[in-house]
Amino acid sequence: MLDNLIGARYLTGLGTITAANTVTVRSRVDGQLMALHFQEGQQVKAGDLLAEIDPSQFKVALAQTQGQLAKDKATLANARRDLARYQQLAKTNLVSRQELDAQQALVSETEGTIKADEASVASAQLQLDWSRITAPVDGRVGLKQVDVGNQISSGDTTGIVVITQTHPIDLVFTLPESDIATVVQAQKAGKPLMVEAWDRTNSKKLSEGTLLSLDNQIDATTGTIKVKARFNNQDDALFPNQFVNARMLVDTEQNAVVIPTAALQMGNEGHFVWVLNSENKVSKHLVTPGIQDSQKVVIRAGISAGDRVVTDGIDRLTEGAKVEVVEAQSATTPEEKATSREYAKKGARS
């Protein structure tokens, strides 16, 4: 009975894990660092308190601006009362028009002063708020860049700590420019393209994500294009600057017969494979290939699941020749698993 599995085509490339966002946390004000409220390496949320700068000078500045605002508000209230009296007296010509205009100008001037005072209060309040430094994004904090007690300033380029956003996290890898059309066509199908991250030795799958974007230009020097995939990474299997192998699924076929690419040959009559019968004798079968990559190919017609195909020594074969079957060794990597199969498999998985 045939298994209802899938023949899959993958594009592969080398890449590096990058944080979704990397932020150097800096102070916006100058002052003495009083406290750090994080542990190196911990996960933080946007808005979490990370550090405090001595707020004394900012509290004093705020009190001064608030006092000036209160004083000028009192002056404005008095000026408005005088203006009201002048307006009444002007009706009986007890004050001149010039005196009335001067009082009106004084009120307008004081109103402008009030607006300036309010801006000064807001600025002083902002300076005080900035003495409490919070996380701008979710992420993992790195090693602290400054110790408590040091004077810091808004001009410090090293900052206090660096936050890398790892939930989610991105993988940037490269593909040959010849693969661009394949990726674009797969994107137009409307379904997210699955991307797998494998370790440096290509022996262990670390995580699964989806294609995020293609770069907008090809690197003319290398003939490649950068591709970005995004991973949820809740298990922290991926880490910034980690080197990985990427495998992107771009096409699938249901109920597919899959054979190693090495078994597929090309002759005058078209594509063919050598098939072994129960007596280990070979016969040529014309086939119709489908999607393929460097390691395996889908066969749409010409052989069936369970047929045995020859992958080595093909140039020495003739019709009806009897061959010695050598069992394939166990495979460990995705590529080895694809090439080690001697049998045509229904929806063989890598």
Curated annotation (Swiss-Prot):
Compartments it resides in: Cell inner membrane
Family affiliation: Belongs to the membrane fusion protein (MFP) (TC 8.A.1) family.
Record key words, sorted: Cell inner membrane, Cell membrane, Membrane, Transport
Organism encoding this protein: Shigella flexneri
Membrane topology type: Peripheral membrane protein
GO molecular function: efflux transmembrane transporter activity
Assembly, per entry: Part of a tripartite efflux system composed of MdtA, MdtB and MdtC.
Gene Ontology cellular component terms for the protein in this record: efflux pump complex; plasma membrane
Gene coding for it: mdtA
Domain of life: Bacteria
Name this protein carries in UniProt: Putative multidrug resistance protein MdtA
Positions of the UniProt region annotated as Disordered: 327-350
Ranges of Basic and acidic residues composition bias in the record: 334-350
